[in-house]
Amino acid sequence: NWRKILGKIAKVAAGLLGSMLAGYQV
């Protein structure tokens, strides 16, 4: 199911982006 895979990738990418932004703000 490519949709499930894309959702998982999007979730991981969002998590990485969020942690990166949080790191820059500190």
Curated annotation (Swiss-Prot):
Expressed by the skin glands. The keyword Cytoplasm does not apply. It is found in: Secreted. Keywords: Antibiotic, Antimicrobial, Cytolysis, Secreted. GO terms for biological process: defense response to bacterium; killing of cells of another organism. GO terms for cellular component: extracellular region. It comes from the Eukaryota. Exists as aggregates of 3-4 molecules. Belongs to the grammistin family. Group 3 subfamily. Thanks to its amphiphilic alpha-helice(s), it may integrate into membrane phospholipids, leading to lysis of the membrane. Has no substantial hemolytic activity. Has antibacterial activity with a broad spectrum against various species of bacteria including both Gram-positive and Gram-negative groups. This is Grammistin Gs C. It comes from Grammistes sexlineatus.
